[in-house]
């Protein structure tokens, strides 16, 4: 019986590992879309037209508009975030989207939004176009990308060889999720530099690329953050005992003396993915420096303080600067919790497919995918030619 149980457990771990590798791969259709749109940028003047048009440029820093920031190299995901936000808005003409992408995706991303106009103001910028964003100003990120321990962490064989008898499938799944290569991408750390990247903005909502907006988000700008910097949904209380049971002890190694000395294991965690930031209040704090300090300390400790991811250093850096907002604004777990309540999904302002099972991937949960796919235009020539099919 013991042998049988061990085999079942090993089978479960193997399934989770395969799922992790599948989630890390770029689907062929999405890769094709990026390549074709990049080619279009080279050959089609319409794909290169200025975004936004010259007369609208002043609105990029107009604080009477609602500014959203999205950082991604996934063109299809970006289109869903933007389309769902605009279609759910009561005043789409007041929306400004600042889409940040990397150098290799820039041409394709620009092509998509130039050729598929929507009733909002769109700006597409590559990381290479931010003069401020140099290695001198963000030296820690070069260290993160080049650190041997991190390369081993993502590419070594120790994941497979870890002692499975000392963990559970639940914990193993969490560890794998933290091993996503996107966590060492500059695009994923970019949100910590919002005040410098957008020096004229007072407030902005930062959205992850694996979300869908289902409700008008303009009331977020009316929330009194009471002098705090980050309006976020807390994740330590709620009916879902897996998704909504996160405290600092779930993210940090409290056997490390620096962690034990500075943090409370019972402190409530909060979510990235849909955050309203008061950039004026943020500029008066040293949040970025704290973030850098703890990233460096974790590297020095050979990743023994936490197992990577961008949330742990943010939990420390924003400590004392978070204002909890109503949980209905942001529903989490659609990428790793297949038992998600569909009725609850319908009521949430923003649903978040955080986890491995992204709606654009083959391992997305079938019953949760239609909420995302309804914002994809499957009649679009580029999408059809890349064989991105509605499932």
Summary of predicted features, one role per range:
Residues 1-391:
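Glycosyltransferase catalytic domains, chiefly GT-A lineage
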